From Swiss-Prot:
Described purpose of this protein according to its UniProt entry: Catalyzes the reduction of the glycolytic intermediate dihydroxyacetone phosphate (DHAP) to sn-glycerol 3-phosphate (G3P), the key precursor for phospholipid synthesis.
Pathway noted in the entry: Membrane lipid metabolism; glycerophospholipid metabolism
List of residues binding NADPH: 11-12, 32, 107, 142, 257, 281, 283
Any one of the GO CC terms: cytosol
List of residues binding sn-glycerol 3-phosphate: 107, 138, 193, 246, 256-258
Keyword NAD among UniProt keywords: yes
Domain of life: Bacteria
Catalytic activity: sn-glycerol 3-phosphate + NAD(+) = dihydroxyacetone phosphate + NADH + H(+); sn-glycerol 3-phosphate + NADP(+) = dihydroxyacetone phosphate + NADPH + H(+)
GO biological process, alphabetically ordered: carbohydrate metabolic process; glycerol-3-phosphate biosynthetic process; glycerol-3-phosphate catabolic process; glycerophospholipid metabolic process; phospholipid biosynthetic process
Key word Cytoplasm present: yes
Lineage: Bacteria, Bacillati, Chloroflexota, Dehalococcoidia, Dehalococcoidales
Protein name, per record: Glycerol-3-phosphate dehydrogenase [NAD(P)+]
Key words of the record: Cytoplasm, Lipid biosynthesis, Lipid metabolism, NAD, NADP, Nucleotide-binding, Oxidoreductase, Phospholipid biosynthesis, Phospholipid metabolism
Species name: Dehalococcoides mccartyi (strain ATCC BAA-2100 / JCM 16839 / KCTC 5957 / BAV1)
Length: 359
């Protein structure tokens, strides 16, 4: 029987463990403390933030021993907040073997380094294991998946062989996995869309309507594509499941933590108050700060990101930020300093259609 070790008793970690265990694979969930492990093992129901009728599947167990959790695993899957990835992979690294896949399920960028999670993992593990790194990302709202609703995700790695190997471990009846070798694009799509989800929450909180939200999402995707291309991503990846797909799901659902934060900001609540009272992390808050600084250092115009940043960190009025974003000032849709989107998406001269021979 294949075994998957999951680092992180987060909603997403438990959701992924449930998917894999229902497939008949052994899942070992690592809890950071013995008390948490005992609580989860005895109650078989993790926390109040999961559906009331949820219980651990038969093949999913919990341990506080990291050695026990990882021993014999085919994959170590890290479902931790992005700012906790480095300390967790440092703990895991000495226990890895060359046969183990190392998969990140986090959607964020590291504060201070602006690194993607696969880069953080690469920093901390033996170079001999680098080929085993993969990432999971896509339009995956955990609560929908736990209710048995269908979803699709993307497994990305530097090689198709590694991506397919990971996808086979995770694919289940209602959870399909596509593969991709554009690991940069898949990670950036999953991370940067959280910024736009904050904005979508602001639009919904202000009752500005679907036209405004559609405009925000579309302009947001343009910014994601611009920054992604500047960092080496394939723009087509950002138009796929890990980019546009995840963007639509996160911006459209009340289940999204980032969307929730945006809505709450329009009610006059402070960011600190909102974050303090959340049971899970809204990754977009830290990602906004990282992306904002990256855009400044690269001299990229990213007005959506800039305005969301000002709301989060400069106490800007959400209503004023929304007004600014809806004021196009008759600029070209693909215009932006150093975006180079004209080069990527420029219209090619149409070929002359040959005339048909009437005979």
């Amino acid at each position: 029987m294949s075994k998957v070790c999951i680092i992180g008793t987060t909603t997403w970690g438990i959701t992924l463990g449930t998917i894999i265990a229902h497939k008949g694979r052994e899942v070992m969930l690592w809890a950071r403390t013995e008390d948490e492990a005992v609580l989860l093992s005895t109650q078989r129901r993790p926390a109040d933030f999961l559906p009331e009728n949820y219980h651990f599947p038969e093949f999913m167990n919990v341990t506080a021993s990291l050695e026990e959790a990882i021993a014999g695993a085919d994959m170590v899957l890290l479902a931790v907040p992005s700012q906790r990835m480095r300390p967790n992979i440092r703990l895991v690294a000495p226990l890895l073997t060359k046969s183990m896949l190392i998969c990140s399920a986090a959607k964020g960028l590291e504060i201070g380094t602006a690194k993607r999670m696969s880069q953080v993992i690469t920093d901390e593990i033996s170079p001999d294991f680098a080929k085993n790194i993969c990432v999971l990302s896509g339009p995956n709202l955990a609560m929908e998946i736990l209710k048995g609703l269908p979803a699709v995700t993307v497994l990305a790695a530097d090689t198709e062989k590694t991506a397919k190997k990971a996808a086979k471990l995770i694919t289940a009846a209602n959870f399909s996995a596509y593969t991709n070798t554009d690991i940069i694009g898949v990670e950036l799509g999953g991370s940067l869309k959280n910024i736009i989800a904050l904005g979508a929450g602001i639009v919904d909180g202000l009752n500005l309507g679907n036209n405004a939200k559609s405009a925000l999402i579309t302009r947001g995707l343009t910014e994601i594509s611009a920054l992604g291309a500047a960092l080496g991503a394939n723009p087509l990846t950002l138009s796929g499941l890990a980019g546009l797909g995840d963007l639509i799901a996160t911006c459209s659902s009340n289940l999204s933590r980032n969307h929730f934060v945006g809505v709450e900001l329009t009610k006059g609540r402070s960011l600190n108050d909102i974050m303090y009272n959340m049971s899970n992390v809204a990754e977009g808050v830290s990602t906004t700060a990282v992306a904002y600084e990256m855009a400044r250092s690269m001299d990229l115009e990213m007005p959506v990101t800039e305005n969301i940043y000002n709301v989060l960190y400069n106490n800007a009025d959400p209503k004023e930020a929304a007004r600014i974003l809806m004021d196009a000032q008759a600029t070209h849709e693909l215009a932006g300093r150093k975006w180079n989107l004209f080069k990527m998406f420029r219209k090619r001269k149409a070929r002359k259609t040959p005339e048909l021979n009437p005979d």
